[in-house]
């Protein structure tokens, strides 16, 4: 079995890290009062209550 290419390994690692950082940034922005569109929208309260019931928050 041949060793894996370092370039391929770096691509996979940085892709996963990029998604993690993107999700972290989106959740931080979403938790701020100015950009929290889930609580400010008309159907947002219903969506939040459904998510809380689903995840037990």
Curated annotation (Swiss-Prot):
The chain crosses the membrane at residues 11-30. One of its GO terms (cellular component) is plasma membrane. The modification N-formylmethionine is found at residue 1. Residues 31-57 are periplasmic. Keywords: Antenna complex, Bacteriochlorophyll, Cell membrane, Chlorophyll, Chromophore, Formylation, Light-harvesting polypeptide, Magnesium, Membrane, Metal-binding, Transmembrane, Transmembrane helix. A bacteriochlorophyll binds at residue 26. It is found in: Cell membrane. Antenna complexes are light-harvesting systems, which transfer the excitation energy to the reaction centers. Belongs to the antenna complex alpha subunit family. This is Light-harvesting protein B-808/866 alpha chain. It comes from Chloroflexus aurantiacus (strain ATCC 29366 / DSM 635 / J-10-fl). The lineage of its organism: Bacteria, Bacillati, Chloroflexota, Chloroflexia, Chloroflexales. The gene is puf2A.
